[in-house]
Amino acid sequence: MDGKPMRRCTSTRPGETGMDVTSRCTLGDPNKLPEGVPQPARMPYISDKHPRQTLEVINLLRKHRELCDVVLVVGAKKIYAHRVILSACSPYFRAMFTGELAESRQTEVVIRDIDERAMELLIDFAYTSQITVEEGNVQTSLPAACLLQLAEIQEACCEFLKRQLDPSNCLGIRAFADTHSCRELLRIADKFTQHNFQEVMESEEEFMLLPANQLIDIISSDELNVRSEEQVFNAVMAWVKYSIQERRPQLPQVLQHVRLPLLSTKFLVGTVGSDPLIKSDEECRDLVDEAKNYLLLPQERPLMQGPRTRPRKPIRCGEVLFAVGGWCSGDAISSVERYDPQTNEWRMVASMSKRRCGVGVSVLDDLLYAVGGHDGSSYLNSVERYDPKTNQWSSDVAPTSTCRTSVGVAVLGGYLYAVGGQDGVSCLNIVERYDPKENKWTRVASMSTRRLGVAVAVLGGFLYAVGGSDGTSPLNTVERYNPQENRWHTIAPMGTRRKHLGCAVYQDMIYAVGGRDDTTELSSAERYNPRTNQWSPVVAMTSRRSGVGLAVVNGQLMAVGGFDGTTYLKTIEVFDPDANTWRLYGGMNYRRLGGGVGVIKMTHCESHIW
C-alpha cells in the first residue's frame, strides 16, 4: 500500500462490472456513500429476551452436565459448571480461572470453608439471577457470598437481616455484621441497639454474653436511648454479676462510660456508693467521688466538663427535615419539601405564598418560619409560618423592619432572631428579634460588621454570626451575641473566608461548611470549639456547595443542596464523625441554592398524616 485511499467499485447487480448509474465508487471510507445517494434503511434491534433465554439454555446445559468444563467439590458435593459463567459473575472465580493458579488447569476444584447448600444457592444465582434469602440460609449464604465476592448477594443478605432486627437478636446480628465486615448492617444494628437499649438489656441472653469492648461501645454512645442514667448503671452491674469472677476486674473500665455525674444525688450515694463491688475498688470509688463533686459543687462544673457530664441525646424518631424555597432553574421558588428518616423519603408539602431565595429559616415552638428573601424581582420583609399538623402556611406574622435577603435566622430564648443580610441598597449589620406572643419585631444591638450571606447558630446561650460578606469581600470573622448584655463580641476567626455557607451545632461544636471565598465555591469544612475558642479543619464534603443548608436530624449532620459552580444541587451529604467522611445520602425533588432548612419533631401519627 502506498498510503493513498483505496478505490472500490461495486455494482448493485451481481455479475455486472464497470460503472453505471446504480454503481457506487468511493474513495476512503468504504461505508460512506457519495453525496446525493440515499442512505440505506436501518433498524437497530435489541432483544430483551436474549439474555434471559441464553441463561436459561446454559442452565439447562449445566443441569444435563453438557459442555461443563469444571467441577466444584464442596464437602461431599460435586457441582458441575462452566468456567466462563462463574468468571463472569464472581471476581473470585475470575482470578482463579484466568490466572496462573493450579486451579486454572484442573477439571475438579476443591472449595473449602463454604457450606455445601450455600454454594449450590450461589451457583444457581449465577445461572438464574435469582436467590431466596431466608432465616435458614442467611448465616451460610452471607459468608459464602463474601468469599466469592458476590456483592449483590451480600447486599441482599444484609437487607434481609436489617428487616429481622429485634431486641432479642440485634446484638447477634451486630456481631455477625462485624465478623463479615458489613459496615452498613453494623451501623443499622448499632442504631437499633441504642434506640431500644432497655428492651435489649431485658432480653438478657445476648446482652449478658456481650464482651466488655462491645458493651462499652454501646453505653458510651451519646445516642443511647435511656430515661435516666440509672438504667445504664443497672445494666452494667447486671452484666458484671452475670459472671462475677471473670468480670469483676473489668468493672472500673466499663464504669468509666457510665455518666455518673448525671445521676441523682440520692441514687449516687444510696445505690452506687453503697454497692459492695464499687466500694471494694479504688478506681470505682474515684469515679463516684468525681460525680459527687460535680453534683455538690455546681460552681465548679464549668471546669469539670467531659464525656461523663455530657447529657445523652437519643435519636428522636419524629424529627423531620424541611427544605424551603431557594433558587432553581434560574428563578426563585416557593416549593417546600420534607425528609422523613423513618421512610427515607422526600415529599412535597404546601408551598409558601411567595417565592423566596436567600430566605432565613428556623423553628420556634414546632412551627417553621420563613423570613425575608428575594422573589426574583423584589427584596422581601414579609414572614410566613408553617404548621406541620395542618400542612398550611400563614402570612399573619409581622414583617421585619427592613427587607432582607441572604439573612441568618435562629432561635434563642424563645425569640426568633434575624441577623444581617441585604436590603437591595446596602449590606446590613442590623439585628432584630421576633416575639411570637406579641407578634412583634424589636431591634437589638447591631453587629460590629455588616454581613450578607451570613450563617448563624446558637450554642451555650449565645447567638453566633459566622462569616458572610461585607458587600465587598467574603469574611472569616465571627462574632457572638450575649442577650443578657445586649452586646456582640468578636471571637476567633475561621480558617477560611466564607459567604453563603452552612452552619449548625453538632456535638457541642459549631460546624461551618461550604460557601464561597473570593474566587470559587468551597467543599471545605471547619468547626469551632467554644471551650478553646479555636476553629479546626474538618474533612471536606464530596461536592463544592455555596448556598448550602446545614442541619442536624436524628443525630446526623446533613448538608443540603447548594451550588457547585456549575450546577444547582439537590444532593444531600451526611457527616460520619467516626469515619471522618462525608457520604452522599440521596437527593431532594428540587435543586436548591440559597434555600433554608429547619428541623421539626413530630409525633409518629403527625409525620404520616398527609
Swiss-Prot record:
GO cellular component annotations of the record: Cul3-RING ubiquitin ligase complex; cytoplasm; cytosol; perinuclear region of cytoplasm; PML body; trans-Golgi network
SMART domains assigned to the protein according to its UniProt record, in alphabetical order: BACK, BTB, Kelch
UniProt domain BTB: residue ranges: 68-135
Stretches assigned to the BACK domain: 170-273
CDD domains membership: BACK_KLHL20 (cd18459), BTB_POZ_KLHL20_KLEIP (cd18249)
Keyword Transport tagged: yes
Region (Disordered): 1-37
Family matches, as Pfam families: BACK (PF07707), BTB (PF00651), Kelch_1 (PF01344), Kelch_KLHDC2_KLHL20_DRC7 (PF24681)
Pathway listed: Protein modification; protein ubiquitination
Per-repeat ranges for Kelch: 320-366, 368-414, 415-461, 463-508, 510-555, 557-602
One GO BP annotation of this record: Golgi to endosome transport
Keywords: Cytoplasm, Kelch repeat, Nucleus, Protein transport, Repeat, Transport, Ubl conjugation pathway
Role of this protein: Substrate-specific adapter of a BCR (BTB-CUL3-RBX1) E3 ubiquitin-protein ligase complex involved in interferon response and anterograde Golgi to endosome transport. The BCR(KLHL20) E3 ubiquitin ligase complex mediates the ubiquitination of target proteins, leading to their degradation by the proteasome. It also specifically mediates 'Lys-33'-linked ubiquitination.
Name of the featured protein: Kelch-like protein 20
Highest classification ranks of the organism: Eukaryota, Metazoa, Chordata, Craniata, Vertebrata
